[in-house]
Amino acid sequence: MINRIILLVIDGFGVGAMPDGAAYGDADANTLVHLAEAVEGLSVPNLEMLGLGHLATIKGVRSTTQPTGCFGRLGFTSPGKDSVVGYWEMGGVIQKEASTVCGAGVPPKVVDVIEQIFGRKTIGRGIALMGTMLRRYGMEHMATGSPILWTDGGNTCGIAMHESSMAPMEFQQRCREIRKAVKDAGLFVRVVAQPLTGRHETLKPQVGRRDFLIEPSGLTMWDVLSRSGQITMGVGKVYDLFSGRGLTKSFPTASGMAAFDEVIGLLNKVPRGLVCASLDLLAEEVGQAALVVQGFDRRLPELFERLRIGDMVIVTGDHGRDLSFPEKTATREYVPLLVTGPKLAHGVDLGTRSTAADVGQTIAEALGAERVLTGESFLDALRPG
């Protein structure tokens, strides 16, 4: 019987382009394979033992003959390739239509709305990850107080401001107003409000990021777990991605490792239910990304040694992020599905799942909740023979 599930979702953890990847310009995407090649091999022995090496030919990662976990790949049925798409589908909600793609940066009419609400000119406005924009425009922002603006090229608009330029609570409120103002235009599903701290040389995200977006259009695993009386904890951006619906409590963090710390702490406090954490490990510079991924792998034993009978751990991703691509933004890829836990089966090939909703369905069944709207549970495959 499963009593507690720890779901670790690594942002951009791709293992190869999906069949429709070419439609997104991602036909050759393979996040982990290309990352490993760039650094002459990854050292991730704990992920290796879970079965990661069975999913792709990743330099430095063996295809072990006796994995301690069950392994497979998750695909996505929903169009798109960002965290909203990934998390919602994992939660059991498949979107039918893709959001408008902003291939030329933040549209001028949206820039006008943002500048009107802030009462200031914006800087940036292009397609990039936040770290790139901070390096490019951090000095100008510190000198002028102008909000740094960017998009992922899809349905997300990001806004960053230093705490000295605007109080974090006021900044969040204005970003909330922006989300309301642009929702009717159908351009952005999500507005990210990222407060900053430090000086230009050390400018970095501050704890307190908020993601403002529409609620999921259907019943999610969070809803059914909440209805069944389960404890549901979101670490990182999870709470905001579901507009808080069905979650007991949120634990915002400023980094992937801080999120992992939070998970370790929650294992001593949460006796049952679901703990889900978003882990942003793939920095834009490949060397740093490799170090962080390897550092995460080294810390996995901290998690494993705290598990008890009735626990299940799932390690997966929400989309790819192939850092060999110039934009270094999200890519349309399969993501790993690695599952382990005391008294669970070892070495079972879970195959290539056509939809990430299989995760939500499995979690709902394992914790005794009603079915979510879509997805096929793989719980039976995890039972020891």
Question: What is each of the regions a protein language model found here?
Answer:
Residues M1-G385:
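Feature captures the catalytic ectodomains and active-site-proximal regions of enzymes
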